[in-house]
């Protein structure tokens, strides 16, 4: 097979694929703003679909008072962003995932939960969290994934008081 490449000037426009990281954050920002806005050019990855499903699960009414069931697929971003958001809007959640997602470390959140008296249990591939985000200081090590910081920064303004995140 012969291929000939001829240099020439190109015209047109290219729309690069959206950043998955930014797409997660945009979906959550819109959901927390009561859906007042429009998103376009979002990544349609399985991770973004998982975030959208979890947002819908958080919005669903549960007359029995049960915690929402949040299937995060294989998305670490979805899981780490939504753990504190679920505490802020629903008093907690029951999280599950696929692949090795539920084996990923959540230690920075667990340390906060111990300090704040928030219940958590990780067993058989399911993470249950239940409690209330209260005013005060939320400390995270400076070397943790930005996913932990983002989750807290999205969740804490939804609660009364004047919380602080320290790195």
Model regions: which residues?
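Structural preference for solvent-exposed beta-strand-turn elements
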Residues: 1-167
């Amino acid at each position: 097979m012969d291929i000939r490449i001829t240099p020439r000037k190109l015209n047109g426009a290219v729309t690069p694929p959206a950043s998955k990281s930014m797409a997660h954050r945009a979906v959550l920002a819109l959901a927390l703003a009561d859906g007042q806005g429009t998103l376009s050019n979002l990544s349609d990855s399985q991770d973004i679909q998982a975030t959208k499903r979890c947002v819908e699960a958080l919005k669903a009414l549960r007359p029995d008072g049960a915690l929402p069931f949040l299937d995060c697929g294989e998305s670490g971003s979805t899981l780490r962003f939504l753990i504190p958001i679920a505490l802020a809007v629903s008093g907690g959640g029951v999280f599950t995932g696929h692949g090795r997602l539920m084996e990923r470390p959540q230690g920075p959140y667990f340390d906060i939960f111990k300090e704040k008296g928030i219940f958590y249990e990780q067993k058989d591939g399911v993470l249950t969290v239940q409690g209330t985000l209260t005013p005060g200081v939320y400390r995270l090590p400076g070397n943790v994934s930005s996913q932990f910081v983002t989750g807290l920064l999205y969740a804490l303004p939804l609660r009364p008081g004047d919380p602080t995140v320290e790195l």
